[in-house]
């Protein structure tokens, strides 16, 4: 004969057994997770994933434009890339290739640097398709090219000005442009970032490799007499090479290199004087003053 309360006692025993089984299962899972054979690989995977993401963001993520450069990169970081075009004797377009050949640039099919305008434009069709549909007349191929390249202004130097905006070309402006184009166009260079200027260009010191030696593009231009030291009252950037730049300019003047050469007989007969050539800064100041006088006269 069963006792009246025997069913209640059995139910308590079953509940207690269930709780005990659950506790054993939880302890078993905890023990398994805390075992070295499980814990060590889990921690290693987590740490490697976090470090990999940080490494990618810091060194292997492509920076297409100046808007993607973090403020703390200036004066601290360098970027490696390929020159896609040279627009003037002291500035050019750079396609950032983080990691260089070690990261696959130049030999992996999906990591090729476009060298033609059409190929550069195609890279931006996807990102700007919506904008093009909204503003079809405002999205030009020039705008698309700017969306995937960095506009670099060589720091510390000022090259002779080409003809533009109705202004005449300075002597040796074409020679300076041809020299720079031959030196760096479609070549890989490294740029040390200094700042962003008012034209959304990156003012940077530019280096290229000649065999195993690193050469400073700005310094070489000064030695060749194809540029002057940058003399604007504001915005000059030299890093730690200002004295080296000024010494190179003085040496070029003494040796009559490039723009510092004395005019030959034909040039003198054509009206060229023997006074010192007009520097790019003097050229800009002269035209700016003339334009102000013209506006004041109106």
From Swiss-Prot:
- Enzyme Commission identifier(s): 3.1.-.-
Membrane topology, record value:
Single-pass membrane protein
**Residues noted as binding Ca(2+) in the record, renumbered to the chain:** 158
* Record field: compositional bias (Basic and acidic residues): 278-298
Note the superkingdom of the native organism.
Eukaryota
Q: Where is the TNase-like domain?
A: 77-262
Q: Identify the stretch(es) annotated as Disordered.
A: 1-24, 269-298
Catalytic site positions: 153, 161, 201
* Protein name per its UniProtKB record: Probable endonuclease LCL3
Gene for this chain:
LCL3
